[in-house]
């Protein structure tokens, strides 16, 4: 690669250049068909990058119309998803296919709400095929993994046949109800920005129930090659679990997907397929179609997942329906892929009113004109000199937020390392947003403290990766609205600011999952809410500003430390359950570091 920062951009540009029927909308990291058919339902999926070919590799005839690409292992922002919906909206509507992860659900749901308010017909389904996560303790529920590819395939075929939005959604949900997956790994994976594996595992060990973001699995055990039947024994164990969970009966038919995680050679995947097929045959389960290869990967992880989809006559026809995408092609659609490329180039030429040969130059001009318009942003200066006494004025508050951004950026790698029980991207996800905030500093409105915070929330919401975007963006937005019109804040105001920030986080979770995070759920709220409570108490007791802030920072630290003994119930760390005990929550730890650094900064401010 060139750099971790350009990893996704370079990859998507390369994909589009190899497949001229596709285009890459760089500003919003969207890979889409050049020609959107207004006579069919558009399908949009996406998520964090690092799972290629999912999801951009499945954009094409018979599957997706667009894929929204987040940073590696971080969901795309709601702004990205919203723009994908706008670009792909048709008279028949749009269906979002969402993998069941906190960040994906938050950002896709928020984008869907925005699009619906604009009058766009859009609906969604949620894929949760991973049986490794089965305990009712986990409020987010099972993860969406390789079974998502089969949802794309069947829903895509239904859309291609001209079915209505409600019918396409019903097909997608039918697949979701009948598909199950289970994964295992021999190594972890390495996120480009981190440069080291997300978890450690011995050469003689394997991880059962591993996630596609480098999350540790359900349990770990030693590999035993001594009998010479390792793959057969492994397959029998996993297939039994899949059959039981799906309640498969003798004589039923399935589609079998043997999916590599990116680091296992194709030979091993076919060996695994041989073993799995023998087990299914012995159990009287008929295989309608087998798919073997890398479809939903985890960068360079050595390992695989086994997916079974129970099929009836309807699903068999949809699975067999012709498809032409970069990563999946069969049937009459083989020729359609070249056909689609020609159609795409003609569509570009028609839209720009030029000959096909001149399209690239004209497209560059159009893109430059659009970029010039985007650059026409106003610049805002803050009035007066920064002052901190028993109140903090706007100029000083702006400096404090800038210091906060510096702390986050400086701790990008340590914050990633703290995210061992999640997917290891917390530091990268939040630092990305605050780097952008610093880059756009001059364009943030600074008329008063509330206006400034709300203005910051727009950048944070769009550029912080994964769940961090909606969570931190909401915290800033709610805090900002509470401070609108204030040009200076006291300890009492700051306590209310933190209380409202916590409410923003709670309401965001409630909107997406029906339950907002509270103390004990092992999230950043374990640090944020105690801090808000301590600040409120200090203000009520008449404490001085700096003393009150110290007490708030101390409460945040104690809350973050307490998460070591908690079982994670929300977010990606929630999927590992009791294995999260002994590790602090990454978000709570991050707030602990940030609040304590800011308390020191304010104490020493002159």
Tell where the protein language model's regions lie, with residue ranges.
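N-terminal loops that bind phosphate or other acidic moieties
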Residues: 1-606
């Amino acid at each position: 690669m060139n750099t971790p920062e350009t990893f996704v951009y370079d990859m998507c540009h390369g994909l589009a250049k190899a497949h001229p029927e596709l285009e890459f909308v760089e500003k919003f990291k969207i890979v889409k068909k050049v020609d959107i058919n207004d006579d069919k339902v558009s399908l949009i999926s996406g998520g964090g990058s690092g799972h290629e070919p999912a999801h951009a590799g499945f954009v094409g005839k018979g599957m997706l119309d667009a894929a929204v690409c987040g940073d590696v292992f971080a969901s795309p922002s709601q702004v990205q998803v919203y723009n994908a919906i706008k670009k792909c909206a048709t008279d028949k509507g749009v269906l979002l296919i969402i993998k069941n992860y906190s960040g994906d659900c938050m950002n896709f749901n928020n984008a869907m709400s925005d699009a619906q308010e604009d009058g766009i017909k859009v609906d969604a389904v949620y894929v949760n095929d991973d049986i490794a996560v089965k305990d009712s303790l986990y409020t987010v529920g099972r993860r969406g993994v390789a079974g998502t590819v089969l949802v794309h395939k069947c829903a895509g075929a239904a859309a291609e046949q001209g079915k209505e939005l409600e019918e396409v959604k019903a097909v997608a949900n039918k697949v979701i109800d009948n598909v199950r997956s289970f994964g295992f790994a021999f190594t972890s994976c390495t996120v480009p920005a981190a440069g080291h594996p997300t978890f450690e595992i011995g050469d003689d060990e394997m991880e059962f129930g591993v996630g596609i973001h480098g999350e540790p699995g359900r349990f770990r055990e030693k590999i035993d090659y001594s009998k010479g039947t390792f793959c057969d024994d492994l397959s029998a164990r996993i297939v039994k679990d899949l059959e039981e969970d799906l309640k498969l009966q003798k004589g039923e038919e399935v589609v079998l997907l043997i999916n590599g995680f990116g680091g296992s050679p194709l030979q091993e995947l076919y060996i695994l397929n041989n073993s799995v097929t023998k087990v299914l045959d012995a159990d009287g389960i008929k295989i309608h179609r087998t798919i073997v290869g890398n479809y939903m990967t985890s960068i360079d992880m050595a390992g695989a997942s086994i997916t079974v989809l129970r099929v009836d006559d309807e699903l068999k026809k949809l699975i067999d329906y012709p498809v032409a995408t970069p990563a999946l092609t069969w049937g009459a659609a083989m020729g359609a892929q070249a056909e689609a490329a020609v159609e795409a180039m003609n569509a570009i030429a028609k839209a720009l009113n030029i000959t096909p040969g001149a399209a690239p130059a004209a497209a560059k001009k159009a893109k430059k004109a659009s970029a010039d318009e985007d650059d026409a942003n106003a610049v805002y200066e803050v009035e007066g000199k920064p002052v901190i006494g028993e109140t903090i004025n706007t100029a000083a508050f702006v400096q404090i937020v800038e210091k906060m951004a510096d702390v986050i950026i400086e701790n990008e790698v340590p914050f990633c390392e703290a995210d061992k029980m999640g997917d290891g991207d917390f530091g990268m996800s939040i630092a990305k947003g605050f780097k952008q905030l610093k880059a756009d500093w001059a364009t943030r409105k600074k008329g008063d403290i509330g206006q400034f915070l709300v203005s910051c929330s727009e950048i944070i919401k769009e550029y912080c990766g994964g769940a961090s975007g909606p969570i931190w963006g909401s915290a800033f937005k709610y805090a900002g609205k509470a401070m609108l019109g204030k040009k200076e804040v006291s300890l009492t105001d700051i306590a209310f600011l933190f209380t409202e920030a916590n409410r923003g986080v709670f309401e965001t979770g409630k909107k997406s999952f029906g339950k907002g995070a509270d103390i004990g759920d092992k999230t950043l709220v374990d640090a944020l809410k105690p801090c808000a409570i301590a600040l409120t108490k200090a203000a009520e007791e008449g404490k001085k500003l700096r003393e009150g802030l110290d007490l708030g920072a101390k409460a945040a630290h104690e809350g973050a430390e307490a998460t070591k003994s908690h079982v994670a119930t929300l977010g990606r760390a929630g999927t590992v359950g009791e294995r999260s005990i002994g590790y602090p929550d990454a978000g709570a730890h991050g707030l602990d570091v940030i609040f304590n650094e800011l308390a020191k900064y304010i104490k020493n401010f002159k």
